[in-house]
Amino acid sequence: MHHRPERDKRVTTHVALVARAFGAKGIFIHGEDMNLLKTIEKVKANWGGKYFSIEFVKNPKKVVRDWRNSGGIVVHLTMYGIPIDNIMEKIINKNTKILVVVGSEKVEGWYYYNSDYNIAIGNQPHSEVAALAIFLDRIYKGGELNIQFSDAKLSIIPQERGKKVRKNE
């Protein structure tokens, strides 16, 4: 929420990269940043994940309301929430689409009261990038670490030392 292009470009880019790599279907971004879009489109073109969508929105509260009205649940990641270990099983058992809310600045109180769950990935200040990665890891139970994108032009050959990238046909 509340992407500030000049101040937040790296953090928001990293949120989008983690979301894509760890299995999310897309991301809503409050505000518009064509450089961010170009960066993620380039990643998708080379590394795959063409299904991953980026949608710039003017009214993120409407996104939350519409998501809930369509039967999905809204999870707000915040250090003030319920510990993730206390609530994760309940969320997984819901077996419905999930909208994850992370903020790049002080998040309005409205989101605390209009999310189905306020979840803490620890109760200390930390990065929304880390929080999203941990949350998606818990949702996919580690399976996201093995995601292979069939539309990838490039893929990594794991190495004990060094780097090896393969061009896919």
From Swiss-Prot:
Q: Which domain of life is it from?
A: Archaea
Which lineage do the record's taxonomy fields give for this organism?
Archaea, Thermoproteota, Thermoprotei, Sulfolobales, Sulfolobaceae
Identify one Gene Ontology CC term for this UniProt entry. cytoplasm
InterPro entries under this entry? Alpha/beta_knot_MTases (IPR029028), tRNA_m1G_MTases_N (IPR029026), tRNA_mtfrase_aTrm56 (IPR002845)
Q: Where in the cell is it found?
A: Cytoplasm
Q: Give a GO molecular function annotation for the protein.
A: tRNA (cytidine(56)-2'-O)-methyltransferase activity
Q: What does this protein do?
A: Specifically catalyzes the AdoMet-dependent 2'-O-ribose methylation of cytidine at position 56 in tRNAs.
Name listed for the protein in its UniProt record: tRNA (cytidine(56)-2'-O)-methyltransferase
Which stretches are annotated as coiled coil? Answer: none
Pfam assignment, any one: Trm56
PANTHER family membership: TRNA (CYTIDINE(56)-2'-O)-METHYLTRANSFERASE
The protein's annotated catalytic reaction(s) are: cytidine(56) in tRNA + S-adenosyl-L-methionine = 2'-O-methylcytidine(56) in tRNA + S-adenosyl-L-homocysteine + H(+)
Question: Any keyword Phosphoprotein?
Answer: no
Quaternary structure and interacting proteins, as annotated: Homodimer.
Q: What is its EC number?
A: 2.1.1.206
Q: Name one GO biological process term.
A: tRNA nucleoside ribose methylation
The entry marks the following residues as binding S-adenosyl-L-methionine, namely 77, 103-107, 121-128
Name the source organism.
Sulfurisphaera tokodaii (strain DSM 16993 / JCM 10545 / NBRC 100140 / 7)
Sequence similarity: Belongs to the aTrm56 family.
Q: Which UniProt keywords apply?
A: Cytoplasm, Methyltransferase, S-adenosyl-L-methionine, Transferase, tRNA processing
